[in-house]
Swiss-Prot record:
This is Caveolin-2. It comes from Felis catus (Cat). The gene is CAV2. Belongs to the caveolin family. The modification Phosphotyrosine is found at Y19, Y27. Monomer or homodimer. Interacts with CAV1; the interaction forms a stable heterooligomeric complex that is required for targeting to lipid rafts and for caveolae formation. Tyrosine phosphorylated forms do not form heterooligomers with the Tyr-19-phosphorylated form existing as a monomer or dimer, and the Tyr-27-form as a monomer only. Interacts (tyrosine phosphorylated form) with the SH2 domain-containing proteins, RASA1, NCK1 and SRC. Interacts (tyrosine phosphorylated form) with INSR, the interaction (Tyr-27-phosphorylated form) is increased on insulin stimulation. PROSITE patterns: CAVEOLIN. Keywords: Cell membrane, Cytoplasm, Golgi apparatus, Membrane, Nucleus, Phosphoprotein. Pfam families: Caveolin (PF01146). GO terms for molecular function: D1 dopamine receptor binding; molecular adaptor activity; protein kinase binding. Phosphorylated on serine and tyrosine residues. CAV1 promotes phosphorylation on Ser-23 which then targets the complex to the plasma membrane, lipid rafts and caveolae. Phosphorylation on Ser-36 appears to modulate mitosis in endothelial cells. Phosphorylation on both Tyr-19 and Tyr-27 is required for insulin-induced 'Ser-727' phosphorylation of STAT3 and its activation. Phosphorylation on Tyr-19 is required for insulin-induced phosphorylation of MAPK1 and DNA binding of STAT3. Tyrosine phosphorylation is induced by both EGF and insulin (By. similarity). It is found in: Nucleus; Cytoplasm; Golgi apparatus membrane; Cell membrane. Residues 1-86, 108-162 are cytoplasmic. Residues 87-107 dip into the membrane without crossing it.
Amino acid sequence: MGLETEKADVQLFMDDDSYSRHSGVDYADPDKFADSGSDRDPHRLNSNLKVGFEDVIAEPVSTHSFDKVWICSHALFEISKYVIYKFLTLFLAIPLAFAAGILFATLSCLHIWIIMPFVKTCLMVLPSVQTIWKSITDVVIAPLCTSVGRSFSSVSLQLSHD
């Protein structure tokens, strides 16, 4: 139908002087960040996220719209997806990344400094607690249960129909 299926390749070239002058940050190794644009999802965390036109909108063979409608809807889908995604990431990506960083830093701090020491302390104290609990059970609960069991074992019931 005349649709272009190849992805557009966009590159931005800046010399080192203008890059460090405009950004205000002097990165130690610019080559480290040079390839970061090629694969931003190396662990395939979002592999199930299908946002291609063919993955979202499909017409069966028996019902096809006009070719011009299909081409225009495909173009409008791609343009709106591109523009809206860029717009949303422009305003939401940095605050959400900041919030996620705070959240993960807080959870990491809690895990490292509170939860794991508490778990290790419980595991350290557990054998002593187990010994004390066994002693209390043997001294108090076992004789009590034995005496209650003997008392109820001597009870006999007889039912009579009058």
